[in-house]
Each structure stands twice: as structure tokens, then as C-alpha cells.
């Protein structure tokens, strides 16, 4: 399991390890109905189980139709950085545009995944709350172990800052400063910051649409 979470955690006990999302928690029949609409729902913490599910659904939908948008709906408190990066890399891997929608609560890695949707297709519902902060991890062991873990945490932090900056238009320095403590955004504030492109109230605004392949027709 990833030792890094996008949020504070007790020493040696990362938040994502406090209880990975059981596979049975998600209603399979409901998931199938959403997939028929090309909608992937991340409605839990980001951990190995939920990330594998989301990645698999993105890959399946892309294989079925590589030209039509896929929607990722986010209502998540965040969790494992490495699990979240697996989802991000899969979003970049497939040729489809992936729109994102914040519904309810998008915090930490939930905020990250919301922000990295396809430009122009990142949405938030009016009463959604978005929270950004830095990755963290419990660090312990020998002096050498602590140095290695600290270097790895710094690398992870810089990676998240760089990617977030690329997708929001903010500088990495601004992302680092603003994420030093929990920073909360309303949907409109998230739009102004560059995390989302539009605050929406209608399904017509976020319904998946046919799109060209990123690499050509």
C-alpha cells in the first residue's frame, strides 16, 4: 500500500490504510447502469480498491468507444496519493476526454482528480465543497530510513504541485503555499482558482459528448 496520503495521518498509520474500500460496498447493478451512461463514480476514499475499479472502468469504456467522452463524478475525501496518480495516469492514457464533476465533497486527492479532468470539461455542483492540501506520511525508523522517506515525500509533493499547477494555471509555488494548510473552496471559488471550468445545475451541461481522438481521427 502507498505510504503517502494527501492529508495528515498519525505516524506510521496513513489514512488510506485505516480501511481500504471493500469491493462489495459499491452496488454492482448501479455501477453497470452508470457505465451505460459512460459515468464513472468515485464515491469513496481513494485507495487501491477504488482506484483499481475506476481505472478498470475507464479502460473498459475507452475500449468500447474511444471517441466519446467519459464522465468522472467525484464525491471523495481523498486518500492514497499513489492510488490517485494511477487514476490520473489512466485518464491521460486513454484517448477519450474525461470530464469531471464535483458533487458534495472533493477533498485532497478528490480535489486533485477533479482538477485534472479535460480542460473546459471540469464541473462542480453549486453546493459542492473542494479542499486542497499537501500530501503527508508518517515517517519513522532509522536516521537513514527517515532521510529516504523524507526525500520520497518531497518528490511526491512536488509532483502533485507540478501537475496541479499545469491544470489550474496557478504556479507550483502558489499551489505549495495555498496547500500548506487545509484550504477550502466553494464551487465558485474553485472556478476562479482554475480547479473547475463551470458551476452547473443541469445534466445537459455535463452529459458525455462525442469527441475526436486526441491522437487524430
UniProtKB/Swiss-Prot annotation:
Originating species: Streptomyces coelicolor (strain ATCC BAA-471 / A3(2) / M145)
Residues at the catalytic site: 108 (nucleophile), 133
The reaction(s) this protein catalyses: Hydrolysis of proteins to small peptides in the presence of ATP and magnesium. alpha-casein is the usual test substrate. In the absence of ATP, only oligopeptides shorter than five residues are hydrolyzed (such as succinyl-Leu-Tyr-|-NHMec, and Leu-Tyr-Leu-|-Tyr-Trp, in which cleavage of the -Tyr-|-Leu- and -Tyr-|-Trp bonds also occurs)
GO molecular function: ATP-dependent peptidase activity; ATPase binding; serine-type endopeptidase activity
One GO BP: protein quality control for misfolded or incompletely synthesized proteins
Name of the featured protein: ATP-dependent Clp protease proteolytic subunit 3
Transmembrane regions: none
Classification via SUPFAM superfamilies: ClpP/crotonase
EC number: 3.4.21.92
Subunit description: Fourteen ClpP subunits assemble into 2 heptameric rings which stack back to back to give a disk-like structure with a central cavity, resembling the structure of eukaryotic proteasomes.
Biological function: Cleaves peptides in various proteins in a process that requires ATP hydrolysis. Has a chymotrypsin-like activity. Plays a major role in the degradation of misfolded proteins.
Entry's Gene Ontology cellular component terms: cytoplasm; endopeptidase Clp complex
Cross-referenced CDD domains: S14_ClpP_2
InterPro entries on file: ClpP, ClpP/crotonase-like_dom_sf, ClpP/TepA, ClpP_His_AS
Family matches, as HAMAP family: ClpP (MF_00444)
Family of this protein: Belongs to the peptidase S14 family.
Entry keyword set: Cytoplasm, Hydrolase, Protease, Serine protease
Subcellular location per the Swiss-Prot or TrEMBL entry: Cytoplasm
